[in-house]
Amino acid sequence: MTNGPGLSRASRFLLYGAAFVILVTGVRMAEPILVPFLLAVMLAVICVTPLRWMQRKRLPTWLSVLLIVLVLLGIGTMAGTLIGTSLIDFTRSLPGYQIRLEREMTELAAWLSGHGFEVSGQLLADSFDPGEILLVVGRIFTGVGDVLGKIVLILIITVFILLEISGFSAKIGAAFPNADRHLASVTEINDNVRRYLALKTLLSLATGVLVAVWLRIIGVDYALLWGLLAFLLNYIPSIGSLIAAIPAVMLAFLQLGPSDGILTALGYLVINTVIGNFIEPKVMGEGMGLSTLVVFLSLIFWGWVLGPVGMLLSVPLTMIMKIVLEASDETRWIAVLLGSRPTEVVVGGLEDEPAEWVGM
């Protein structure tokens, strides 16, 4: 049985698979170019709302774009300065943390010996190296540092996108005969991604501020750095908040002792539980349209393809891919598999007859 002119269903499946492999290989090879471009596109999507607002206030487009760029440049400069100075100070403080660690481990070994467990304090100290904290933080911020190093390129691309965005609809209408369908897809992509990024940014900002305030109250060093880390990694679904908590909790144990370390961990747990499990689902609703499994797999996939930035952008990139797949009868079945509710009607795809996907 065939499903297309001259191609069997299996042949079409193999053809799609080969095209996917070639496309992914090309994207991985083009990662140094694609990452700044994708970040610029996402920045432009976020900045469209303030741009439209300033235009309604009768500000010229060039002045509106200039103000937006100055704000972005200021934020990037402050973030880069905070990261750089904090990591330098952190490195200088490591010997002091090492001394505290050895003292704590000696006391722990004595307590264990009193309860019948003979353990060397030096062995415990060697098994918990504070340098690992710096290593974890350094790896996390490596991708951020690379992005900040390309901030000029990202801002230039963002400027051109914002300047061109007003005439984009007219270009689509002139370029495609079936312009309404393409414009509908572009509008859906823009609305969904902009809503997701705007809400996620606000929730991440709230997470970062609460973490920084809580750590400052407890007395953990570099509270602003850990707040910034919580803000950035909150964009990463599922595991971002957990990764953000690890270095701060380790430092709290090392700097202030077990009780304050537990308080730090509890603070992270409460903040992320309230925001991630209660506030975010109510605010986001069904807006993402992606299943939980797909969100987690997209995190792994885009992280492998585009590195740390791919993990940050995994959800919006998968949302875009799903909307694009929905626009074609040939690929709509893939979009259904990516979705959170398998109740859509699939037309075309691998089957000759339309099939209604019914949840179990």
Model-found features: residue ranges?
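Membrane-spanning helices that line or support transport/gating and their immediate boundary helices
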Residues: M29, I33-F37, T49, W53, ...
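Hydrophobic alpha-helical transmembrane segments of membrane transport and translocation systems
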Residues: G261-M360
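Short amphipathic alpha-helical coupling elements at transmembrane boundaries
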Residues: R52-R56, D89-R92, G96-R103, E107-A110, ...
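Anchoring transmembrane alpha helix of integral membrane proteins
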Residues: M1-T85, I323-M360
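Generic alpha-helical transmembrane segments of integral inner-membrane proteins
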Residues: G17-I22, G26, L66-A79, L148-L155, ...
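Membrane-water interface of transmembrane alpha-helices in multipass transporters/channels
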Residues: P32-L39, I217-L229, L256-T264, L290-V295, ...
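Alpha-helical transmembrane segments and their immediate interhelical loop/hinge regions
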Residues: R12, G145-L254, P258-L266
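Juxtamembrane membrane-interface segments in integral membrane proteins
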Residues: T2, G6, P50-K57, L63, ...
